[in-house]
Amino acid sequence: MSTRETFKISLLAKMPKDVINQFLSKDKTPFSVLFLSLLVGILAGLVGTYFEQAVHLVSETRTDWLKSEIGSFLPLWLAAFLISAFLAFIGYFLVHRFAPEAAGSGIPEIEGAMDGMRPVRWWRVLPVKFFGGMGALGSGMVLGREGPTVQMGGAVGRMISDIFRVKNEDTRHSLLAAGAAGGLAAAFNAPLAGIMFVIEEMRPQFRYTLISVRAVIISAVAANIVFRVINGQDAVITMPQYDAPELSTLGLFLLLGALFGVFGVLFNYLITLAQDLFVKFHRNDRKRYLLTGSMIGGCFGLLLLYVPELTGGGISLIPTITNGGYGAGILLLLFVGRIFTTLLCFGSGAPGGIFAPMLALGTLFGYAFGLIAKVWFPELNIEPGMFAIAGMGALFAATVRAPITGILLVIEMTNNYHLILPLIITSLGAVIFAQLLGGQPIYSQLLHRTLKNQKLQQQDLPPQSPNS
């Protein structure tokens, strides 16, 4: 027997048996949890992928109607207004009448559910978010489909737990988190970002165990495979592939990150302010709420005719920007304009997310920054498109406070793996400056606001009599 083998045997003999058994027992993941995670991922992938196709179908149908039947007996501007107003009305009505928790992104609802503070009524959230999101996003409003897919994915996870009568709370928690990861993986064709989003952004709520992490990974991979089978394996955003930038330009990426760090804190404040202003305006009165939402949707129908860059989630706008054709001044004007339209749509409580609008804002300012830097520093080999990609990750990192997720998300969406170093520098710079200014992550703010409103509503309820 060799000296090495003798040492191994003596070392194992000195270790308490309960320590060895405990270590091995931690690695015994129940097969049932893995199977249910796979099922959650497949269903979340189907829901997320077909939700995307449904939104595209509504948008294309709206455009076809304007080009043909309706445009023949109504003025084009009036037809555009009425169609988008009706689509928005569907979204707002379904939310207000059947599932108020389906308003907005939905990600804070999943985080609240993981903490045991919010219920997941999947039987009403799934249809309301799906069809309400079709209406709101199809109207041309500045909303993303990524938040809704995360909420619907989480709802799928809870649905599977209920259907299979899962009683173990840790398993139910793992399937809820797995559904959220699968939803994001299907929305962006980004499995790594889906996994990291749950592990990093939801870290205050996520219960870290071998089982829960494996469940999240399996679900995200399964959902992404479903997406690729249906939509193909191309990246979500088609744009130029860049080589690694010169080291002399890295300081500019850090400066861009600092600017986004400041803006991210301001942007988060404006989002919650917009939500509070809308609530004060409609006071949860259904008629006023629906009229306000319909008018907003109709206005975006008009904008689609004249300034389409200010409408929609923004994913289709990103490659248009990076292909050139816009000056820095126009890009900055669009940046300011889309800030306003994003706040208007998301603050109104429509069933839609903010991921895609944030990425579009990051692209607009980042590309404008790159164009300006190219003029001011002609001796440097500057590609403005690199700063657009870095801007996407930086704004995400500054607002969501999940830099690793933002980096992976942008890389997977654009296939620009050579830009990982500038993305890290820009994103970390954005997070550090945002923290120095004392800002809080956007989804934490939104969850806190939801829980505060829930507590106020409970206090307003009349006390029940002992005999009731």
Swiss-Prot record:
Motif mapping: Selectivity filter part_1: 104-108
Catalytic activity: 2 chloride(in) + H(+)(out) = 2 chloride(out) + H(+)(in)
Record site feature (Mediates proton transfer from the outer aqueous phase to the interior of the protein), residues: 146
Pfam families, per the entry: Voltage_CLC (PF00654)
Keyword RNA-binding: no
Site (Mediates proton transfer from the protein to the inner aqueous phase) location in chain: 201
Residues that coordinate or bind chloride: 105, 354-355, 443
Record localization: Cell inner membrane
Swiss-Prot/TrEMBL keywords: Antiport, Cell inner membrane, Cell membrane, Chloride, Ion transport, Membrane, Transmembrane, Transmembrane helix, Transport
Job description of the protein: Proton-coupled chloride transporter. Functions as antiport system and exchanges two chloride ions for 1 proton. Probably acts as an electrical shunt for an outwardly-directed proton pump that is linked to amino acid decarboxylation, as part of the extreme acid resistance (XAR) response.
Protein name per the record: H(+)/Cl(-) exchange transporter ClcA
